Structure formats: C-alpha cells, structure tokens
Amino acid sequence: MTFHFHAFLGDIDDRLYQAEIAVTSDWHLPRRGFPATSKQMTKQSFTLDQQAESERIAKRIARAGICSRREAEARILDGRVTVNGEMISSPALNVGARDKITIDGKPLPGREPAGLWRYYKPRGLVVSDRDEQNRETIFDHLPQDLPRLMTVGRLDLDSEGLLLMTNDGDLARHLELPSTGWSRKYRVRAQGQINESQLAALADGVTIDGIRYGQVIAKLDRQMASNAWLTVAIREGKNREIRRIMEYLGHKVSRLIRISYGPFQLGDLEDGAIEQVKARVLADQLGLGDSTLEASEKPTLSINKPAYKSGAKRGRNANHSGKPSRGNPHKTGRR
C-alpha cells in the first residue's frame, strides 16, 4: 500500500515547490540499515487483560486513561488516591474490579476500550497538557468529543507531523519501547550543502557530547542552492536527536516532519487533523490476531489550525473557547 503526503515545502529563500512524498508500508529503511521491516520482525505482543480480576492500582489508573502508570504512582505517593475511602501511600497495592478508587476526590472512570489515533501535530504547539510559559498546547486544539488522550512520545515545539495518541496508558508505554523494533521516519530540511558520506557514516551511530546515538539512516532526497531535503530514520528517539545530529554535522534543521511511526503513516492526513486507527489494524500491529478491541471508526476530524504565524504573540486563550482536560503525556524524548 502506498500513501502520498502532499505538502508545500519551502527553501531558505522562501521559494515554494510542490512535493509529493511516497511513503510505502514496506519502505522502512535503505539496504544499509536496520536488517528488517516491521512486517519481517516478530511482533511484540501486547495483552490488554481487560477482565483481570486483580492488578496493580497504578496499572488500573493508567488503563482508565487518566495518566501514565508512572504518573499514577506519583499521584499515589502524593496522597491523591483513595481505595474504598482510605488514602493509600504506596503503589504496591493490588485492586479488584469491585474496589472503589478516587483521584483528587473524583471517582476513577470505567476503563474505555483501548484506541489509537493519528494526529498531524502542527508547528508551534507544545506537546503537553499544560505549559508553564502559557504557550498553546496540542490539547487546546483537539476536538471536544474525543476521549481523554495521552501522547505516544513527543515532538518538540518546532517539529510537526505524525503524533500517535491513545486513551490507554499501558498501550502508550508499549508503543514507546525500543523493543517494538519500530523506526520513526522524518522529512528533514537542513541548511547548507550535504555531504553524503557523512550521512552514510551515521549508520554506525555517533557519540555527541558524551551521548551515544544509535543507528541513524539518512538519505539525501534533494539538494538545493542553500539547503536540502533528507529522509531520516531512527529507532531510539532521544531528546532532539535529529536536530543535534545535524548540528553536529554542521547543518541547522529548519523544518522537521515526522512521516511515520513504525507501521503507522502520516499519509494524507492534513495539518491539525486527527483520525482514529481502525481496531482491526491496531490489533494486527499489536499481534493480537482476532482483537477484542472495540473502536468506533469515525471519519477524520479536522481541527482549526492555530491562527498565528511565526513570531506572532500566542496565548492560552487565543482562537479557542476552552481547554479540554486530556491527561498527561509521557515525558519521553522529543525529536
């Protein structure tokens, strides 16, 4: 299957050209790269355990879509969680289906069926449920009728493209693990003339300021007078990994678009739009076979793009009527 992502990509002189990026489901990396595609790898099984009679309380909270398991443990240690009317101070507690749990005085909602969404994260939005600098976040622009969502990994303020979101904390953690074997691919605009031999050397990894970055597969797509477009694939996704590696090679990244995360593609998703992954597709990619997952197959939801341009003043109350509470994204590395 081939998806096409249409975008206007500008060079450093602001000359625009129409580009069509073909993203195929089996094009994960060039030959000199990771040894197998996701289809060739053994799928990492993910068990939902929807009918578990007893489980750790942090796991129960995460599966209710409130927050990640780690954040649930922190809330327990802060004394914000009660079980059957008693405040608990340790996450080392198993709870059953009949136990009554509250967080900050509010009853824990029933567990929703696990779902996954593809979201085109626009540039200029923070991937967080709240921002100390009062900048707008992705949650300020999500439709109100979505369930409580958290992100799978992050993208930094100036990055854009595919961001996976889920209502299940355990699923989010599972998809972030390097053991899934999934690569993340990006279209990268970098300033200057690109040395292809330097790109090839990244396949062996690189150490920058004491930080070891694993295998990076980078391919030059188009060299222009003042900048170039590349396709870059990574697996670890450390904090600002691609930007730091390109700066190490002497090139500043002026645009970064994630086009895939494992088998999930940006495809023709429009800037600011969100679309739920079909339950059977999600089940297949998680190795569940005949899935017990339930998910409504809603059409793509278009989101009002932020009505600001680079350098414009932005505020939490700009261009939206209110901020939904969606849960806390994981604090993993940004790209």
Regions found by a protein language model. Give the residues of each.
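Short hydrophobic alpha-helical segments enriched in small aliphatic residues
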Residues: 5-7, 14
